[in-house]
């Protein structure tokens, strides 16, 4: 992959952060002065790590803590697989493609276009595992279900407007007695329209075929990144499964301060509490497994033969923007600091996933928006800009040979 990008597509000037980021920053600054809080029934701190979702104790895990329930679920998946999804080699080994989708807001249009272009190239595999955070969490279930849902991704990421995601109320009122500057009712309705009973059933079917879908959220109470086993939720048969599935997607895309947190009912020792969850990007900008099961589990395949992993990461953002002088003002400086910190976090996540790949003998490939693509735009969700990013992603994927095979600064190896 050429990290310098293709020929110029537009004026490559790096703009300030989106309106959402501005709202979040303004809110954070004002809230530092201290305002009243809304009542809640939070989990006592000493019980936080023991909290589970009622009737579904095996659907999530804390990142960085191997979880026996999620590991057993993954181990069971190898016997459920269809040979048509993951053909066996002559020696009995199997290659497992994984897809990790990053956050990035409206820039998810790039990832949606890339997936569609990948399909048109004829080389898009069936993924064993799909993960997502933030906008990647909105994309992940559709990517998991495969090319049949490419058109849904295209529609969402080329026609959605800001008003389809959130609405602003009285900012002063929200700062004084609220918990966010915007109302995400429109986004919740959008998720509800696309993720219905039939959709959930298809997720469950793929889970029972040995494939796995994970979404990450940030638990603000526990200060931890949480990995949710979405296929297990879908396949649980519980009456609350559909609502829970939708809530996890919404939570992972709920930018703190700008958007309201999402509350999950949990229990400890028979008593009910609530947990406050926000955008998964707070905990990780992109993740593969979150350290919730043993790395060797794919190699071992439950004793069914050797497994090899092929890791694909789509960064729904521009990791290498061209320099752009910062205005000498408090908001401009603060916004640029947040922007730079976010990009640094992505680099760290790429190195972490790459390190896993090196240890496990897996292939590693990733893609980002080329640095000379113009990211200008005043509206947070602008169909014109998003259609342009969709087209960029589609063109790159359809052309093939677009992947980088090592993190920034590392020697690039030929793609397998």
What are these regions (language model features)?
Residues 31-34:
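C-terminal motif of bacterial Sec signal peptides marking the signal peptidase cleavage site
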Residues 131-132, 136:
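Gly/Ala-rich beta-loop-alpha elbow adjacent to hydrolase catalytic centers
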Residues 19-26:
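Sec-dependent signal peptide recognition
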Residues 36-129, 144-416:
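Patatin-like phospholipase
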Residues 1-19:
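N-terminal secretory signal peptides that target proteins for export/translocation
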């Amino acid at each position: 992959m050429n990290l310098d990008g293709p020929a110029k597509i537009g004026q490559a000037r790096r703009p300030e952060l989106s309106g959402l980021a501005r709202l979040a920053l303004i809110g954070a600054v004002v809230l530092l002065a201290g305002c009243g809080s809304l009542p809640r029934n939070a989990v006592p701190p000493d019980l936080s790590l023991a909290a589970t979702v009622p009737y579904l104790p095996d659907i999530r895990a804390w990142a960085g803590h191997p979880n026996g329930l999620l590991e057993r679920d993954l181990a069971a998946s190898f016997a459920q697989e269809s040979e048509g999804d993951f053909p066996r080699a002559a020696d009995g080994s199997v290659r497992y493609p994984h897809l990790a989708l990053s956050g990035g807001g409206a820039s998810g249009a790039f990832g949606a276009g890339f997936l569609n272009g990948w399909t048109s190239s004829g080389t898009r595999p069936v993924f064993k595992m799909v993960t997502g955070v933030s906008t990647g969490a909105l994309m992940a279930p559709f990517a998991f279900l495969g090319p049949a849902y490419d058109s849904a991704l295209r529609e969402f990421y080329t026609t959605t407007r800001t008003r389809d995601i959130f609405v602003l109320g009285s900012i002063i009122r929200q700062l004084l007695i609220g918990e966010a500057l915007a109302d995400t009712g429109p986004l919740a309705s959008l998720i509800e329209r696309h993720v219905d009973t039939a959709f959930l059933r298809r997720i469950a079917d793929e889970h029972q075929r040995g494939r796995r879908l994970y979404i990450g959220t940030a638990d603000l109470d526990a200060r931890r990144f949480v990995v949710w086993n979405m296929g297990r939720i879908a396949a649980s048969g519980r009456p609350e499964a559909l609502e829970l599935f939708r809530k996890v997607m919404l939570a992972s895309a709920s930018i703190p301060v700008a958007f309201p947190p999402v509350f999950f009912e949990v229990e400890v020792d028979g008593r009910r509490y609530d947990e406050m969850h926000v955008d998964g990007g707070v905990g990780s900008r992109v993740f593969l497994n979150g350290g919730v099961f043993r790395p060797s589990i794919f190699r071992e395949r439950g004793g069914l033969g050797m497994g090899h992993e092929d890791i694909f990461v789509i960064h729904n953002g521009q990791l290498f923007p061209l320099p752009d002088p910062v205005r000498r003002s408090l908001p401009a400086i603060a916004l640029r600091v947040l922007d730079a910190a976010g990009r640094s976090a992505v680099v760290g996540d790429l190195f972490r996933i790459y390190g896993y790949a090196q240890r496990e003998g897996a292939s590693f490939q990733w893609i980002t928006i080329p640095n000379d693509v113009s990211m200008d735009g005043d509206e947070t969700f602008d169909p014109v800009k998003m259609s342009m990013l969709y087209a960029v992603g589609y063109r790159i994927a359809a052309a093939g040979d677009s992947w980088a095979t090592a993190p920034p600064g590392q020697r690039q190896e030929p793609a397998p």
